[in-house]
Amino acid sequence: MRTRTIRSALALLLVSTANAALAVSLNPKGTGQALIYPYYTVNNSQDTLISVVNTSAVGKVAEVRFLEGYNGRDTLAFTLFLSKFDVWTAAVTQASDDGGAILKTSDASCTFPRILTTGASFLSTGYDGSGTLPADSGPQTITRTREGFIEIIAGGDIVADSTTDVAITHVQNGNAGGGVPPGCADLSATSFFSDIVAPTGGLFGNATIVNVGLGTFFGYNAEALQGFTDTALFSESHADGPTLADANSSDAAPGGAIANIFNQDGRPLSLSYAIGVDAVSAALMADSIYNEYVVDPSLGASTDWVVTFPTKHFYVDGAYGDGPLQPFAESFTDGVSNVLVEANIYDREEGVVTLGPCTLCPPVDITPAFAYEVNVATFENQIVPVTAGPLGSALTSLLIPPNGTDGAAIVDLAIGDGGHSLSGGADASGSAVTLKGLPVVGFMAYNVINTQAQPGMLANYSGTYRHRSTMSCNGPAGECASVITGGGQ
């Protein structure tokens, strides 16, 4: 594993202004410059409905990027233009029985390339070697595009009354064809570069995973990163649009950024990083995640946990350099990049079952691991074991035996593989700070079936709950005594 000595040294040179600088952080209020949607799927006859809202009185240009779940390779990307107070919606659905995913929208907001009424098909070029990156070791078929996660990153604010602003602003004329921007056809990959400035915040997003036939409905909020950049992220030298690796701050080294996390009492801890993606990872770090489960057979209940590591590919994919890099310990090889963890499953009366790595883990001897960038952990039903939970995922690398019919679980992300941690951060005094755990987002999804409903009536009751989390660090005692991430997944 490569060391980060040079990165740490660069970060130490930049900490004198860290407290006052723009810094990337997870916004608990839900709006920001960059949005992360932890999961989309079209498996199991499901569709994923997505929306993004511009809450500000200024237009935005954003990169929308869909990444498959094995290794975080791109499957579809395009530029979205949001006028002031605009809302954009779309649906991800399955193209055919043996096909991949396809994006469909009837929304009038401008995109480049333009999304036709027939939809935009997800592509395998990001991982099969026919695109700009070499093929990876994951599945090469188009069905790999059916599950993954989504990024929407604002790359610039559109200058008011500029050519681009006029082109993308919806014209409300009171007619049936009203509300349509007049200049979508005039946009190109570069036409707007001179009409944008550094982006401000104000985006929020939602997603819903729907199975019409079963009547299931799993809705969640996108995670929002604020302070992602203080420069425009679209330019002649960066025409492909921003990714999570493009976080930056003018007070950090070129290519670097500052992250804000928070002490338990709410005081911010600013850490400078020489590489932008490390600051994003810092904002998302958790040493443990917490949530509930329910698998009561009398309720027909089932539970999945979505556990997504949205920056993982930058540390484990050989296309981005030699790896693996901490906080991850295993490169993406033979279709997996395992992350060893420890899980403690509690029933409602404090009884606990521990799943290793540990010396003695009675009564179940399982070493749990998350194999992919997007992971779906399924809680098995004690009466009828299952291999796929309510989300019907093909990315279920961990089946968790529950402790009773319902309760809570804690997944320790710091303990495995000899210890997961992110080094390279420096506080305002120049002291090195290492964050324990992994960068993670996700939620719990459950479904309950009412077997007493009238025949022919849909009787599924679904819900989602965002993961909660804690984070710890090694560094100055006053700063690292008890630390949590900004939003607390």
Question: Which residues fall in each region the model found?
Answer:
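N-terminal interaction/assembly modules
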Residues: 74, 88-89, 97
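Asparagine-centered strand-capping/turn motif at beta-strand->loop junctions
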Residues: 52-58, 68
